Amino acid sequence: MLNKLNLNKLFFIAITLSIFTLEAQESSDESADSMEEVITTARRTEESVSDVPIAISAFSGTDLDEKGITNMEDIRSLVPNMLIQKSAGNQSVAYVSVRGMGSQRGSVQYDNKIAIYVDDAFMIRPQGSLFDLFDVNNLQVLKGPQGTLFGKNTTSGAILVNNNLPVVGEFDSSVKVSMGQRNLNSIAAMVNVPLTSNAALRFVGITKKQDGYINNLDGFADDGGIIDNETFRAMLSVDITEDLNLLYTYSMFDSAGTPVYANCEVYTNSNMLSGGPAINVLTNGMKTRAVESC
């Protein structure tokens, strides 16, 4: 009798565990089906990321918003084997490397090894590549040589940024306000305005300001690391026919912040007069006054 009761208990426990396993599997399947599918243009045509035979990291605009990505520099936290560094001499210049290959040159005479495309427009030089992000449709990072479809400057890969296009026949708007440490203040706004039954305008504006984190001791210049960015984008879309669309885009990014100095320590120089600011002579002959990290 005792053995029979034990067998009944084991049978009941086995059935219960099976039911829980089935419910968990169904819940997991429903969650997978509800995931947002990201469409990529890595092969110059719209495809699902899962169908593209390329090492790619792709994110929708919703993904970027949920992860707090507001600037090109932030995407380094999302993409494996990718490094984005801000130039010490220019707040808007990015040094990008993928799989250990990239460029550490920020001058206008040097080409990148990783191409950046914004709405299919190639950014020729690294200046202005650390722009702010808002109202983005998707962002894609292609790893490995991409010269066949994207031409030169793609030895290590390519970054594709596709913004939301104007929507015909629909008025829409959105505003995002951000505040943070070092007096961070950021306002981003978007307005979509329908003009006619086949034309629409879309405006995006971003302003971002933040105090620097490097104190300048001599008092004759601003602190290092100040962020003062302004972004404006206007897009006009006209559906000429069902198969022909005219898209005009004007984009402006202004970065008036102060650079992060090459060295952030206090230097003393016995050749300087007592009480005078220390001078650090850099390897390229440039000079910077003494600064102190906060």
Predicted regions and their residues:
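Cleavable N-terminal targeting peptides that direct proteins into the secretory/outer-membrane pathway or into
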Residues: 1-31
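Acidic, small-polar-rich N-terminal luminal/periplasmic segments of exported/outer-membrane proteins
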Residues: 31-168
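Residue-level signature of outer-membrane beta-barrel architecture
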Residues: 42, 120, 143, 179, ...
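Short secondary-structure transition/capping segments
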Residues: 96-100, 214-215, 259-260
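Outer-membrane beta-barrel translocator/receptor signature
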Residues: 111-113, 125, 134-143, 148-218, ...
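Outer-membrane beta-barrel domain signature, strongest for Gram-negative TonB-dependent receptors
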Residues: 221, 227-294
